C-alpha cells in the first residue's frame, strides 16, 4: 500500500469521525460527507488507474455525479431548514413531517 493510498484512507476515516462528532449540525455533517465523497473519488481514481481496465474509468465519474446530486439535495435541505426554523440543527428535521 502506497503512502498516497494510506493518506486518502486516513482522510476518509477523519471525515467519518467528523460525521459522528458533529452530527448535531447539518452544515458540518454535509461538509464531512463531502470530504468522504472526495476521498472516495480520489481512491477510486487511483484504483482504476492501477487496474488498467477501460470499463473501470467510468466509476469515478459516476461517483462524482452522485456526489454532486447529494450536495445539491443537502444544500436545498439546509436552506429549507434554516429559512423555516432559523437554525441548522438536525433534530429539527423531525419537524418537517406533514
UniProtKB/Swiss-Prot annotation:
GO cellular component: mitochondrial inner membrane; respiratory chain complex I
Keywords: Electron transport, Membrane, Mitochondrion, Mitochondrion inner membrane, NAD, Respiratory chain, Translocase, Transmembrane, Transmembrane helix, Transport, Ubiquinone
A biological process from GO: ATP synthesis coupled electron transport
Entry keyword annotation includes Iron-sulfur: no
Chief location of this protein within or outside the cell: mitochondrion
Domain of life: Eukaryota
Membrane topology listed for this record: Multi-pass membrane protein
Family recorded in the similarity comment: Belongs to the complex I subunit 4L family.
Protein name per its UniProtKB record: NADH-ubiquinone oxidoreductase chain 4L
Lineage, top ranks: Eukaryota, Metazoa, Chordata, Craniata, Vertebrata
